[in-house]
UniProtKB/Swiss-Prot annotation:
Homodimer. This is General odorant-binding protein. It comes from Lymantria dispar (Gypsy moth). Keywords: Olfaction, Sensory transduction, Transport. Present in the aqueous fluid surrounding olfactory sensory dendrites and are thought to aid in the capture and transport of hydrophobic odorants into and through this fluid.
């Protein structure tokens, strides 16, 4: 679902910043 994608995106974005 779009909700899951949004959550995953946020998680990945944070991981990339770290």
């Amino acid at each position: 679902t779009a909700e899951v994608m949004s959550h995953v995106x946020a998680h990945f974005g944070k991981a990339l910043e770290e």
